[in-house]
């Protein structure tokens, strides 16, 4: 229960609320999804082309050009997804995840990925994979998901420089795993 402002408890409640730690998070629409963007991720950076959209945020590292990215891409493929039975949606998500990986692999050197695993995003079956590669000679790591929502194929990803998942990536993964359908 929240105290009403006219009660003697209200000033005490307000003082207490102001002393609690707060991690500013904001919600953003990303195609058919809503995501709670973690604290410190700047953006969005948006682009639209060929019936698809991409939106991304970056948590920059001090004294560095790089940072951790959080990216969502959605492609409207029309009613073709309507014919996919619920029991086949994880297979379809895995198929499209492989297509997204092929595109990513063309941009990276030494590209490798692990086994696909099943996940649930916004209550829907999703495919997930961890990958590694190199950008300009620097090791890069990422985790990518794919989920089918309505008429959209949606890819969600976080990546960073290095060979291990970073704390910033874990923050982005929490946001990805907490998405909601709009």
Q: Where are each of the predicted segments found?
A:
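Bacterial N-terminal signal peptides
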Residues: 10-21
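Surface-exposed amphipathic alpha-helical segments
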Residues: 38-43, 153-182
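N-terminal secretory signal peptides that target proteins for export/translocation
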Residues: 1-7
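Conserved polar/disulfide-associated segments of primarily extracytoplasmic proteins
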Residues: 50-142
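N-terminal "mature-domain start" segment
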Residues: 25-58
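A short, solvent-exposed beta-edge/loop patch
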Residues: 143-153
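Soluble non-cytosolic domains of exported or imported proteins
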Residues: 32, 87, 91, 95, ...
